[in-house]
Amino acid sequence: MKSIKITLLFLFSIALGLFTSCEQFLEVTPKESISDALTIVDKTSAETAIRGVYSALADGGYYGTTYQSIGYLSGDNIVWTGSQSQVQEFINKKVNADNSTISTAWIAIYRTINRANNVIAKVPTVSDPQLTEALKNQIIGEAYFIRALAYFDLARVWGGVPIVTQPTLVPTENIGIPRKSVEETYAQVLADLETAEPLLPSTTNRYRATKKTVWALKSRFYLYQKNWSKSEEFASKLIADSTNYRLIKPFSSFFANNARGTQESVFEIFYNGTTEVNAHRGQWQTQTNGGTRQWAPNDSLVLLLNTPATGGGRSALIAKDNQNRWYGNLYYRQPGSDPSYVFRIAELYLIRAEARAQLGKINEGLADLNAVRSRAALAPGTAANKDALLLAIEKERRLEFALEPHRWFDIVRTGRAAAVFKVTDPNRFVLPIPVQQLLSDKALTQNPGY
């Protein structure tokens, strides 16, 4: 793994302790190769360090574009209109180890982990009267949550990965750490979430980690682990909080007209469009809108979204340009101030629907599915049995998150990659470890089949 020295500006509009609106980050320079003693020594530097963790999460290599593109391009909703053969590898479900996208994502995620590790290691030792116990716990809890999310994202792309829990001070420090199993990697995710939860406040914040953000990731985590009861339990915690979270209508309300931080959002990443830029719009928008349209909805997705019985209000996700070409319109703000959506309440409804279906609670699961359909201005769906309900949920997730990076991961985790994607080689369900990492660290082993 490479240790990268980075300076990102990430502005917050109000102080770290407030939890009611988007908070813009102050200047952040959390160096990963300087003396540890100079990094976090008081309240100000502790706040700076946690901002640096969020800035790494928002980076273009992670939720800013690259990591999410793995989910988009590997599914069956998007076509690549550009000329780079490496991007087409995702569409073809045949990604090579020298693919620059996976290398960029790997480095960005481990950079995020390293910054979180720095906070986790140093903030508990800070003695500053201005750094209250509550604020100290919050900062540490946020770092644990983000590290949990990072390892979760690593596990679902690469399987088992090296588990690094101490901050990197020089680029060679993490050389020689072997990969853990996928089970051990997911165990690290849960351990970090269990640590984060009691440290975090119970307030609602759509841009910072709280207990509620932990519940959202726990619900998704347990879905991947097939622990249906736990997945249902944590989804229900958020759905029950209807004062703060609800399926807002019409469907486009959570993103259209420059909306951000709506009641639809459980956790989204803020970009101001100047010092923090979300590069998604450049890939989705057309040339006349200042983009490249290199990611575009394919014909099957366009048909599904534009058919009233299946797409409903979700047809707002796509639009036509002056050349009669369809393009994705979830990310449209210029210059690049769209949020990145990490958790929406719609996902929690569909997670609970799936968990309930697996538990044999067909009517309750169908009610959750139909809540999402109703918000999309669709007629209620029907399902006579568990299998029918699971298939209906799968189809709904494809359209509800048509331009969000869920589809590939959904189909792989449910064991339907052969049926849906015609991918029969299970080695292809995870991606190769980037060749640059293998060359620099002989302790790393490649995934089978690559």
PLM region spans:
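Acidic, glycine-rich segments characteristic of secretory precursors and extracytoplasmic regions
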Residues: 2-4, 18, 22-71, 443-450
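Bacterial Sec-type N-terminal signal peptides, specifically the leucine/valine-rich hydrophobic h-region
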Residues: 16-19, 151
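Short, surface-exposed recognition loops and adjoining beta-strand edges that mediate ligand/DNA contacts
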Residues: 36-37, 64-85, 161-165, 201-281, ...
